[in-house]
From Swiss-Prot:
GO terms for biological process: mitochondrion organization; mitotic sister chromatid segregation; mitotic spindle assembly; positive regulation of mitochondrial fusion. Its main location: mitochondrion. InterPro entries: DML1/Misato (IPR049942), DML1/Misato_tubulin (IPR029209), Misato_II_tubulin-like (IPR019605), Tubulin/FtsZ_GTPase_sf (IPR036525). Pfam families: Misat_Tub_SegII, Tubulin_3. Keywords: Mitochondrion. The gene is mst. Belongs to the misato family. This is Protein misato. The lineage of its organism: Eukaryota, Metazoa, Ecdysozoa, Arthropoda, Hexapoda. 'Misato' means 'beautiful dawn' in Japanese. The keyword tRNA processing does not apply. Disruption phenotype: Irregular chromosome segregation during mitosis leading to death before the third instar larval stage. Larvae show abnormalities such as absence of imaginal disk tissue, and reduction in brain size. It comes from Drosophila melanogaster (Fruit fly).
Length: 574
C-alpha cells in the first residue's frame, strides 16, 4: 500500500526555534506552485507530506502547515499570535489603523471581519491589544510586499526567530511556557532539572501530550520524530522527558539534535564560573538521557569547542563569513545541515526511512554521531565533479559542526548527501573527456556513485552511504545571503581567482554537502564532557540544590556516560 510515512518535529528552546525557522523557510522555498518550471525533476524533490499536514481553517480554506510542536519562553512570539496566523478569530490590523479608535477605523475593522468571514458585525466584539514590535521584513510580508532585492538587515535587527519566519503554523504548534519570560542576558529556564519539572506540571503536560496525540492520530504511517533542542539550559530536560514519553507511547525512531548556543551562556544569579558548572551539569544529564532515549543524536554548534572557549573561536567555512555569536546567521548554517542531511529519506522516490538512516550510522550502539558540512560545496564555475574530487586529494571536503570533534578518515561510518550539483557537472562526454578517461571515477554514472567511490578510496576501512539531488540550497530572503563572500557566484560556485560577483548581486542558491558520521574518535567528545565534570561542585550550585537533584542521581549519570563512551573504543568497532 502506498502511503506517506510522516515525521513529527519538535523544537524546544529559543535557539532551536531559530534553527527550525530557517529549516521551515527552506521547505517553503522548495514548494512548487502551478506551472512553475524548474530544472529539478519531481521525483528528486522532497515529499512535503512527510513533514507537512493538510487542514482547513475556520473560513473553510485549505491550509498546509508543518507537523510541528514548538516550545519557547514568553516574549519570543512578538507580533505572532499563539494560534498562528491562518486560524483563529482575529483580524490582522494594518499599520495605518494603529492605534484603533471608535471612529472610522473601527468601522473598517468591522467591515474586514465581515468580508473575511470571521463573524457578522452583530457578533463582533472588539478587544484591542497593545501594539507588538514587528520587524520590517514581517511588516512587508503581511502586506505581501516583500522586495527580494531590499536589504532588511536581519542579521543586525532580528531580535527573535519570528522576525524572519516565512512559514505559517497550525494553532497547536506554538507552546509558550507560562511565567518564564525571555531574558537576553540569562537563561530563564536555567537547569536541566527545571525542564523536567516543567514537563511534570499538569498545566503543561496534559495539553502538550494531547497535541502530540492529535498529530500522531492524523498520520497514516508515522515513521518517527525529529527533536531539536537547546541542551545548554532547561530545555534539555524538557526534551529528554519528551523523548521518554515518545518511546513509552509510540515506539518510533527519534533523531535528536542537541544545539549549543554560539555564545557564552549565562544563568540567573550565577557568575561566569558557576554558569560554566551549570552548563556542564546540563550537558551531562542531557547526554545521559539521549544515550538512553534517542535512536541517534548529533550535537551541533558553529563553535570549535564549547568548553573554556572564552574567545568564542568559531569554525570556518571557505566562502562564508559570519558573526560568531549571531543567532540569525549561525542558526542558518545548522538548519542547512539538518535540511540536507535528512533529504535522503525525505525525497519523493526513495526507499530510505528515518529508522534505516539512523541504524546505518550507529553501529554497536554508538548513538552519538558527528555533523560535517560543506557550504558552498567548492566547485569552480565550469568545473566537473570528477576534477574537483581528483584535485582535492587528502584535503577534507567537510567542516565539522559537532564541537570538539573530528571523526578522522579511517574506520568511519557515514551517510553523505550532496545537493545542487547538476548531472551534467559529473564529467565530460567521452569525446571531450581527455584526461578524465584515465580516472577510475569516469566509470561512475551518478553524483552519489562518484562520492561513494571517492570516500572508498580516501577513507580507509570506512563505510559510506551516499545520496544526491540536483535541488540546491535556496539562499534568497530570509536566508542570510550576506554571509557569502564576493568570490562566490550567484549560483553558489567559486569564481576564478580574483574575480567577484557583480556589485549588488546576491547568491540565490548554492550546492552543498552534508554528512552524518561515526567513528571511534567521537569518544574524545564524550571524554571532554566528562573531564569538565571534575571541576563541578554540585553542592555549590544553588540552582540545582533548589531543584532537588541528588548527588547520587548525578553520579549515576556520569557513570553511565562513561559506559556509553566505552562503546567508542576500537574493540567495539563493527
Amino acid at each position: 500500500m502506498d502511503y506517506t510515512r510522516e515525521i513529527l518535529t519538535f523544537q524546544f528552546g529559543t535557539y532551536a526555534n531559530y534553527v527550525g525557522t530557517h529549516f521551515w523557510n527552506q521547505q517553503e522555498a522548495n514548494f512548487r506552485y502551478g506551472d512553475e518550471s524548474e530544472q529539478v525533476a519531481e521525483e528528486q524533490l522532497p515529499n512535503n507530506d512527510i513533514l507537512y499536514r493538510e487542514g482547513r481553517n475556520d473560513l473553510n480554506r485549505t491550509t498546509y502547515t508543518p507537523r510541528l510542536l514548538s516550545v519557547d519562553l514568553s516574549g519570543t512570539l512578538g507580533h505572532l499570535p499563539v494560534t498562528g496566523e491562518l486560524y483563529g478569530n482575529f483580524v490582522q490590523r494594518d499599520e495605518e489603523l494603529l492605534p484603533l479608535s471608535t471612529g472610522e477605523e473601527l468601522e473598517q475593522v468591522r467591515k474586514r471581519a465581515e468580508e473575511s468571514g470571521v463573524c457578522s458585525p452583530e457578533q463582533l466584539e472588539v478587544q484591542e491589544q497593545s501594539k507588538a514590535s514587528i520587524s520590517e521584513y514581517q511588516r512587508d510580508l503581511l502586506k505581501n510586499a516583500v522586495v527580494p532585492e531590499k536589504n532588511y538587515q536581519l542579521a543586525a535587527t532580528a531580535n527573535s526567530w519570528v522576525d524572519f519566519l516565512y512559514a505559517r503554523y497550525h494553532p497547536r504548534t506554538l507552546n509558550v511556557l507560562p511565567g518564564l519570560i525571555r531574558d537576553p542576558t540569562a537563561q530563564a529556564l536555567g537547569t536541566y532539572s527545571a525542564g523536567t519539572e516543567m514537563w511534570q506540571e499538569v498545566s503543561f503536560n496534559e495539553e502538550f501530550c494531547d497535541r502530540i496525540r492529535l498529530y500522531v492520530e492524523e498520520c497514516d504511517g508515522l515513521q518517527g520524530f525529529h527533536v531539536l533542542f537547546d541542551i545548554d539550559d532547561g530545555f534539555g530536560g524538557l526534551a529528554g522527558k519528551c523523548l521518554e514519553h515518545l518511546n513509552d507511547e509510540y515506539s518510533r525512531a527519534s533523531f535528536a539534535l542537541p544545539l549549543h548556543y554560539p555564545r557564552i551562556t549565562s544563568y540567573p544569579q550565577a557568575d561566569t564560573r558557576l554558569s560554566h558548572s551549570i552548563r556542564v551539569v546540563n550537558n551531562v544529564l542531557g547526554y545521559h538521557q539521549l544515550s538512553e532515549q534517542a535512536l541517534m543524536f548529533t550535537p551541533l554548534s558553529t563553535l570549535e569547542t564549547i568548553w573554556r572557549n572564552n574567545n568564542l573561536k568559531s569554525r570556518s567555512l571557505p566562502g562564508l563569513q559570519w558573526e560568531t555569536d549571531n543567532l540569525y546567521q549561525t542558526s542558518a548554517l545548522l538548519a542547512a545541515f539538518f535540511d540536507t542531511a535528512t533529504l535522503s529519506y525525505r525525497l519523493r522516490q526513495t526507499p530510505e526511512s528515518l529508522l534505516r538512516f539512523c541504524e546505518c550510522v550507529t553501529p554497536a550502539g554508538r548513538k552519538m554521531t558527528a555533523a560535517g558540512l560543506a557550504l558552498p560545496f567548492g566547485l569552480r564555475e565550469g568545473q566537473d565533479l570528477i576534477e574537483f574530487l581528483d584535485q582535492s586529494g587528502d584535503h577534507a571536503l567537510l567542516t565539522q559542526l559537532t564541537p570538539g570533534c573530528e571523526p578522522g578518515t579511517s574506520y568511519v561510518v557515514q551517510s553523505v548527501t550532496a545537493r545542487g550539483i547538476p548531472a551534467e557537472r559529473l564529467k565530460r562526454p567521452r569525446e571531450l573527456a581527455g584526461d578524465q578517461l584515465r580516472m577510475a571515477a569516469y566509470s561512475c554514472d551518478s553524483i552519489s556513485h562518484m562520492l561513494q567511490l571517492y570516500y572508498q578510496c580516501t577513507y580507509h576501512g570506512s563505510v559510506t552511504n551516499a545520496a544526491a539531488t540536483p535541488l540546491p540550497l535556496k539562499t534568497q530572503l530570509p536566508f542570510p545571503y550576506e554571509m557569502f563572500a564576493a568570490g562566490i557566484s550567484r549560483d553558489g560556485y567559486r569564481l576564478p581567482e580574483g574575480a567577484e560577483r557583480e556589485t549588488g548581486s546576491r547568491v540565490d542558491s548554492a550546492p552543498m554537502l552534508a554528512a552524518v558520521q561515526n567513528s571511534t574518535k567521537l569518544g574524545e567528545h564524550l571524554d571532554n564532557v566528562h573531564a569538565q565534570s571534575h571541576r563541578v561542585q554540585l553542592a555549590k550550585l544553588q540552582a540545582y540544590s533548589n531543584s532537588g537533584l541528588e548527588r547520587d542521581e548525578y553520579d549515576t549519570a556520569l557513570d553511565q556516560l562513561l559506559e556509553f563512551r566505552d562503546l567508542y573504543a576500537d574493540s567495539q568497532y563493527l
